[in-house]
Amino acid sequence: MPTDNDLKAAILELLRDLDVLLVAHFYQKDEIVELAHYTGDSLELAKIASQSDKNLIVFCGVHFMGESVKALAFDKQVIMPKLSCCSMARMIDSHYYDRSVHLLKECGVKEFYPITYINSNAEVKAKVAKDDGVVCTSRNASKIFNHALKQNKKIFFLPDKCLGENLALENGLKSAILGANSQEEIKNADVVCYNGFCSVHQLFKLEDIEFYRQKYPDILIAVHPECEPSVVSNADFSGSTSQIIEFVEKLSPNQKVAIGTESHLVNRLKAKRHHQNTFILSSTLALCPTMNETTLKDLFEVLKAYKNHRAYNTIELKDEVARLAKLALTKMMELS
């Protein structure tokens, strides 16, 4: 049975032999992040991988991330050690998108501007592109939202209801959730949100903020905008994973901070701060189960199989889906 060090050495050798670009999302296991050429959030990695001069991309993340790279750089080969799903992305597909549009029309919504969070599959991004919409990430969501407001249409935000609600609150707008609010509320809302969510960021509650503030009156609270509106509106800072990292790294070592995002990322920030004055906001382990699936053995096996001409877990998209998804992704990049 090979040790972790044996696997790491073999992986590094295969990466060199195959001339691979290895990228890993911030929420991956530490041993995966350690080997990656680049780590980042979904947008950063999509840009890096699609613009790389490498023809083979190995993406350690969840499925929609690999699809985004394939859509942006269709000629590249994209493989994933594990075809893990994002629970939020699985909450909507092209059929559910069409059904949602039908429900909007039943509520008297004749025109809308769709924004899909990057946590959605390529077919959903393609549908949004067909309706002249755009993709957003947590990092550029405010810029994309401001662009959408200029279209003078009702905004349909999917699939994350929390990010949609938080953006509406940030702009003083009324929001409603499709399938949860009445037809009248949908008709009168400025922003209609699809009823999806992140299972990890739902763990953070207002009570957690109150607990830490009572215990440490000078503590700062930094959270991801996928958290519930009551959490985001009571935090000192809200931002994407990259923005949270930037925020925390600028703090004084003596400044206490509680962070509301995935535990792998928080633990790395704790280590950088010598495990002092840095806390995870929830008492429940905030671990993304699907991000946690990829192991060193998975990475080794997918590289070895590729070298032996037995490639698997390759990302494939239909030409038209890739073309349309790229339109929505490229539009986002131009606007942000």
UniProtKB/Swiss-Prot annotation:
Catalytic activity: iminosuccinate + dihydroxyacetone phosphate = quinolinate + phosphate + 2 H2O + H(+)
GO molecular function, one term: metal ion binding
GO biological process per UniProt: 'de novo' NAD biosynthetic process from L-aspartate
Pathway(s) it belongs to: Cofactor biosynthesis; NAD(+) biosynthesis; quinolinate from iminoaspartate: step 1/1
Known cofactor(s): [4Fe-4S] cluster
Binding site for iminosuccinate: H25, S42, Y117, I118, N119, S138, H224, P225, E226, T241
SUPFAM superfamilies (alphabetical): NadA-like (SSF142754)
Chief place of localization: cytoplasm
Note on how the cofactor is bound: Binds 1 [4Fe-4S] cluster per subunit.
Binding site for [4Fe-4S] cluster: C86, C198, C288
Gene Ontology CC: cytosol
Localization per record: Cytoplasm
Gene3D superfamilies per record: NadA-like
Annotated keywords: 4Fe-4S, Cytoplasm, Iron, Iron-sulfur, Metal-binding, Pyridine nucleotide biosynthesis, Transferase
InterPro entries: NadA, NadA_sf, Quinolinate_synth_A_type3
Role description: Catalyzes the condensation of iminoaspartate with dihydroxyacetone phosphate to form quinolinate.
PANTHER family given in the database record: QUINOLINATE SYNTHASE, CHLOROPLASTIC, QUINOLINATE SYNTHETASE A
Family: Belongs to the quinolinate synthase family. Type 3 subfamily.
Name of this protein: Quinolinate synthase
Organism (species): Helicobacter pylori (strain ATCC 700392 / 26695)
